[in-house]
Amino acid sequence: MKTIKQRISYAVMGLITMGFTACTQNEDMAPTLKGQEINATFSVGGMQTRVNTLGDGKNWEDKDKLKVSIFTDSDPGSTTVLSFNGETWSRSGSFRWLNGYEQHTILAVYPSDTDFGKNNLQYDLQTDQSSEGNLKNADLITGYWYDAPRFDLSIPMKHRMSLVTIVYHVGTADYPNMDISEPQVYSKHNSVDFSRDDRQGQFVMSTPTANPAWVQACKHDDGMFSAIVIPGSYKTGEIFLKFKIGDKNFHAKMRSNTEFQEGHRYTYKLDVGKDKVKLTQISVDDLKGWDSNNEEDLK
């Protein structure tokens, strides 16, 4: 009988980890690990999904899932799903070494319905992010490991997209009792390919070459909207936002050259008046999540 263990360590690294062990493992086991349950730690505790990031982050949500694939060059392998119920993680399906000698690839992906696997490493941006659910599902977090089978391994997770948050103000004298509608954010690309750099043990994003896309943003809180875009370069004067007030169309341009990076949030202030539309960058934040320095907030 196999067991599933969840280890929670705030004091050491602030990680929520899922370890999978076999009851039959002991010091007298055969040298080969073929068929043995994999004892893996996924560092998801320092990560947060983007809907949580709209607030203060610091937690995964009920029904969040990670899809984990394991394969080799000669074996298509198998897939399991890690599910969170608001308190603990569990898994479905087998998670075992395919053989005891070949280099294995383990690829963990959020959201779990992302069609990543051995034969498909292309990410297509979801352009309708007008609801919080759609915004969350447009996120992309990956974990990658490549090596020969071993008893214990750690798989770090990494945000791959860029988050744009707009804090806006509409002049009440110019537009009384009116609000922004149909906000859109410009993504320089609508898809991107990834590749396995096995020599360096990295899962890397190639330079995107796909067509640009307008992303329907999610309005949230009071006077804010957000969207996830594929990292890319923006030039001064390039139209970055589109929106409406009443039946009138507006756009806002970048005021400086900006390079969006993986796993960062770019926050802007948008001021709209009768004769002005001004976009000003407020901050750039690294969305690695939290660490052990504030574990008291997580308990």
Protein language model regions, located:
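Sec-type signal peptide cleavage vicinity
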Residues: 2-10, 19-299
